[in-house]
Amino acid sequence: GVVELSMNNGPVNTLTSDALFGLRDCIEQLSNDQTVRAIVLSSPFKVLSAGLNIKEARTFDSAQQDAIVRGLNEGFLALYACPKPVICAINGTAIAGGLFFVLTADHRISTPTAKFGLAEVRVGVDFPMGPLEIAKATLSKNDARRLMLRGKSVDAETAKNMGIVDLIVAADDVLPQ
C-alpha cells in the first residue's frame, strides 16, 4: 500500500545526521518491501522542513560536520533514487535542506501559502555534493542559480511555474491528494 512518512522533529523539522541516516535506512527498507506501492512525505507542522539548525551547526566539530554532510548526501540520494513513487505533501515552508524533500519527490503537492527556497548563501553554508547534484538535476540552470545565489524564498505559484511544485490545493486537501 501507501506508506506515509511524517517528519516529527517540531516545530520546524530541523535536519540532524541521525534523522538523515534514519531516512536513508527507512527508504532503503521501503524500497525493498514488495507490499509498498508509494511513499508520502508529510509534516504535522506548519513547516515541512527548515533544513539544518544553523546556530547548532556553527558549533559542530569536524566529526559532526562530516556526519551531517554524509547524512545530507546519503539521506537525500536514497530518497532521490527510491524506486517507489515518492509524493511530497507540502503544508508549509521548505527552505534550505528542507527543499530537498520536495526536489527528490516524484510528485509534489503544495498548499497555496507554502514557501520554497535555498537560504544557504544567506548564512554562508556550502551545499553538500549530493543535494547540489539533485538541484542541478531537478531545476533549470536559471532557477537553480536564482535560488542558490539570491537566498530568497518563492511562493507556491512561483514554485509551480519553476517546476518545483506540481499541484497547488487547499491545505485540507494536501494529504488526501
Regions found by a protein language model. Give the residues of each.
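Conserved CoA-thioester-binding segment of acyl-CoA-metabolizing enzymes
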Residues: 1-44, 77
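Terminal peptide-recognition signature
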Residues: 5, 22-23, 41, 53, ...
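A secondary-structure boundary/capping signal
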Residues: 8, 43-44, 50, 91, ...
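Glycine-centered loop/turn positions within well-structured domains
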Residues: 10-13, 46, 132, 145
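Glycine- (often His-adjacent) and acidic-residue-rich active-site loop
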Residues: 21, 35, 42-77, 94, ...
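Catalytic-core regions built around general acid/base machinery
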Residues: 26-29, 71-83, 89
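Crotonase-fold acyl-CoA enzyme core
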Residues: 80-177
